[in-house]
């Protein structure tokens, strides 16, 4: 994406900033979007505004340089004489060499300063439907939540690293076939009218295929000259052809995206796109009048309140799990009907777990370490809690996505805990939730190519890709090259990541990107942020869902949930 700049003076400022910060124009545009989001609006792109943006970019760069120098100072060592310590000679406190064992011991005092919950805990950072007034009265009896799993848990218990090429290719091909059928149904065309994009055509035709990067280098990125369209085996024998998007007024594409395109291939070597045909979304969930009456009775016609939080749950220099203690303490002081906690709990990338320098434990396995340190903290919860793993969870024996659920019994968790897979869709009374902890938002933001997209907001656009593609992780081959946040896709089982028959009412996508909560095409979409980043406590989300008020629905016995109209969503400081 390029800045629409006509002013020569503004153009000079942009070029200077590109040179100073050593970045390309698309990266700068992403930073501009982020800068606008932090201000809660979309500032006009003029000289004064851009200078303010440039000032912030320079300040951030200087701060990063200073932090790097502070972490790696140039030290001139003095050869030590055996038996002599210069500090003791000068009367200074003697510092012992920091080993892996002492690292944890030295860091413990710093974590105690959190005192579980600071005075800042619970401060509202962002809110959706702020104007919504939800009246809560003291119920005569506690709310009874009906939690229904909309997935087959046994299907997630597959053997990893046993992928067969044929099975993987079938899954990828079936995705194109699915969207081919949807295109025919939406635009009232027959299956025979779908064309092979690699065949020579002078007249406009409709084709369906997968966006692929043309690159000989591992980790190549999309640009206007490297877009390929891969057809299905039935319609085009899986052949890939160059896709030209120069004539499109707007687009937003990424590798793995299934698209329906109208255009022609006059040369036989390149398909020239004239229009990208939108695919109709899935319908929203609905409930019968009888089901609704049951839900109202279970909740005493009171709103449902839910906390949602995502790991990592330990600071970077210890395994005392201070953020998790803070979260559980906050929940106990401010009770809700349900808590949804996402991993990683024992982060495989944590320095102490990665190096094995874990002290003060009798555990002989990572599962036992979870039982010893995490389970006692979680057991303090008295309300229902749903645990969803992350592929970086060291206590999980299933480090591939789609990912099997935790074993509640093996981890010693009490009966008020439910362990769901990653991803999952489930219902809480009349509200359908969708959750995936694989960081599709971050990975797509690094691979996306766009021009004047329909969603100007970055977060809304990334979420819309998930909704339109009907899949929790539509990116392919995915963020497999990410060092600390890989995708670890098991291609043969990607069908487990597809949406079922309906859209979720609420979509939860934890990400390393900045927290947010938005109404994206009538789906309440949120990233609760991380419980901790480095040595600081992070954020979590709170949902307050008012009961559905039934109106006149004509002759129909089913009612749309309309969750986006009756949900107040907040991002809170931990």
Swiss-Prot record:
Protein known as: DNA polymerase alpha subunit B
Family the entry assigns: Belongs to the DNA polymerase alpha subunit B family.
Disulphide bond pairs: none
Known role: Accessory subunit of the DNA polymerase alpha complex (also known as the alpha DNA polymerase-primase complex) which plays an essential role in the initiation of DNA synthesis. During the S phase of the cell cycle, the DNA polymerase alpha complex (composed of a catalytic subunit pol1, an accessory subunit spb70/pol12 and two primase subunits, the catalytic subunit spp1/pri1 and the regulatory subunit spp2/pri2) is recruited to DNA at the replicative forks.
One CC-aspect GO term: alpha DNA polymerase:primase complex
Gene3D superfamilies tied to this protein: 3.60.21.60
Organism: Schizosaccharomyces pombe (strain 972 / ATCC 24843) (Fission yeast)
Post-translational modification: Phosphorylated in a cell cycle-dependent manner.
Principal location: nucleus
Record text on subunit structure and interactions: Component of the alpha DNA polymerase complex (also known as the alpha DNA polymerase-primase complex) consisting of four subunits: the catalytic subunit pol1, the accessory subunit spb70/pol12, and the primase complex subunits spp1/pri1 and spp2/pri2 respectively. Interacts with orc1. Interacts with orc2; the interaction occurs on the chromatin, is stable thoughout the cell cycle and is independent from spb70 role in the alpha DNA polymerase complex.
């Amino acid at each position: 994406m390029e800045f629409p700049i006509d002013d020569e003076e503004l153009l000079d400022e942009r070029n200077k900033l590109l040179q100073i910060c050593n970045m390309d124009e698309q990266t700068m545009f992403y930073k501009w979007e982020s800068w606008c989001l932090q201000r809660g609006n979309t500032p006009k792109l003029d000289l004064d505004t851009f200078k303010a943006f440039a000032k912030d970019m320079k300040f951030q760069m200087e701060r990063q340089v200073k932090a790097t120098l502070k972490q790696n100072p140039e030290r001139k060592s003095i050869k030590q004489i055996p038996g002599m310590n210069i500090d003791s000679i000068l009367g200074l406190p003697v510092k012992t060499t920091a080993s892996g064992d002492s690292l944890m011991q030295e860091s413990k005092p710093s974590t105690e300063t959190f005192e579980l919950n600071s005075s800042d805990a619970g401060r509202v950072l962002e809110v959706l439907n702020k104007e919504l007034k939800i009246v809560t009265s003291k119920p005569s009896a506690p709310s009874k939540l009906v939690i229904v799993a909309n997935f087959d848990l046994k299907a997630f218990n597959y053997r990893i690293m046993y992928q067969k090429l044929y099975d993987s290719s079938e899954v990828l091909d079936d995705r194109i076939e699915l969207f081919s059928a949807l295109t025919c149904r939406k635009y009232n065309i027959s299956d025979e009218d779908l064309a092979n994009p690699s065949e020579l055509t002078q007249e406009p035709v409709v084709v369906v295929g997968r966006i692929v990067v043309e690159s000989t280098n591992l980790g190549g990125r999309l640009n206007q000259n490297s877009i390929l369209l891969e057809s299905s085996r039935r319609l085009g024998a899986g052949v890939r052809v160059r896709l030209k998007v120069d004539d499109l007024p707007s687009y937003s594409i990424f590798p793995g995206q299934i698209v329906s395109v109208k255009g022609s291939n006059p040369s036989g070597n390149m398909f020239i796109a004239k229009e990208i045909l939108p695919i109709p979304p899935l319908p929203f969930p609905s409930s019968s009048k009888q089901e609704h009456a049951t839900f109202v009775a279970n909740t005493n016609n009171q709103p449902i309140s839910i906390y949602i939080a995502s790991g990592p749950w330990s600071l970077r220099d210890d395994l005392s799990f201070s953020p998790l203690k803070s979260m559980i303490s906050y929940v106990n002081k401010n009770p809700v009907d349900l808590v949804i906690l996402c991993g990683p709990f024992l982060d495989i990338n944590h320095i102490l777990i990665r190096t094995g320098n874990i002290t003060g434990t009798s555990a002989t396995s990572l599962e036992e370490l979870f039982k010893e340190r995490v389970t006692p903290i979680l057991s303090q919860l008295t309300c229902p809690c749903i645990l969803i793993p992350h592929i970086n969870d060291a206590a999980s024996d299933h480090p591939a996505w789609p990912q099997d659920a935790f074993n509640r019994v093996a981890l010693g968790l009490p009966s008020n805990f439910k362990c769901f897979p990653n991803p999952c869709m489930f219902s809480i009374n009349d509200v359908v939730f969708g959750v995936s902890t694989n960081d599709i938002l971050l990975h797509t933001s690094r691979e996306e190519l766009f021009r004047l997209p329909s969603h100007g907001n970055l977060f809304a656009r990334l979420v819309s890709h998930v909704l339109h593609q009907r899949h929790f992780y539509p990116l392919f081959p995915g963020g497999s090259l990410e060092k600390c946040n890989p995708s670890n896709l098991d291609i043969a089982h990607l069908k487990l990541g597809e949406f079922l028959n309906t859209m979720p009412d609420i979509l939860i996508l934890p990400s390393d990107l900045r927290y947010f909560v938005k109404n994206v095409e009538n789906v309440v979409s949120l990233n609760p942020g991380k419980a901790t980043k480095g040595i600081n406590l992070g954020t979590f989300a709170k949902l307050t869902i008012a009961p559905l008020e039934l109106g006149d629905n004509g002759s129909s016995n089913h009612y749309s949930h309309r969750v986006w109209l009756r949900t107040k969503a907040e991002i809170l400081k931990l």
